Amino acid sequence: MKTLLLTLVVVTIVCLDLGYTRICHKSSFISETCPDGQNLCYLKSWCDIFCGSRGERLEFGCAATCPEVKPGVNIECCSTDNCNPHPKLRP
């Protein structure tokens, strides 16, 4: 009887949705689970003094709200897992 009860408890815990967390790219090839409350992924890009030789600077991450757009900075926000890949790695 105890085994049956323990089995039911384990199955219940496994089947419960204990809260979903977003997974976003943190770099070109690494993804991480976002902290609670941060359900958006973003990709921020901008040019610095090396833009001509190295290309745009990129910042990947998670956010609760889409970061504020500033002059010279492009920001893309999305709300599905790993939706913020490196621009050259997009399908």
Swiss-Prot record:
Disulfide bonds join C24-C41, C34-C62, C47-C51, C66-C77, C78-C83. It holds the Pfam family Toxin_cobra-type. It comes from the Eukaryota. Gene3D superfamilies: CD59. SUPFAM superfamilies: Snake toxin-like (SSF57302). GO terms for molecular function: acetylcholine receptor inhibitor activity; ion channel regulator activity; toxin activity. InterPro entries: Snake_3FTx, Snake_toxin-like_sf, Snake_toxin_con_site, Toxin_cobra-type. Expressed by the venom gland. Residues 1-21 form the signal peptide. Keywords: Acetylcholine receptor inhibiting toxin, Disulfide bond, Ion channel impairing toxin, Neurotoxin, Postsynaptic neurotoxin, Secreted, Signal, Toxin. It is found in: Secreted. Belongs to the three-finger toxin family. Long-chain subfamily. Type II alpha-neurotoxin sub-subfamily. Binds with high affinity to muscular (alpha-1/CHRNA1) and neuronal (alpha-7/CHRNA7) nicotinic acetylcholine receptor (nAChR) and inhibits acetylcholine from binding to the receptor, thereby impairing neuromuscular and neuronal transmission. This is Long neurotoxin OH-57. It comes from Ophiophagus hannah (King cobra). The lineage of its organism: Eukaryota, Metazoa, Chordata, Craniata, Vertebrata.
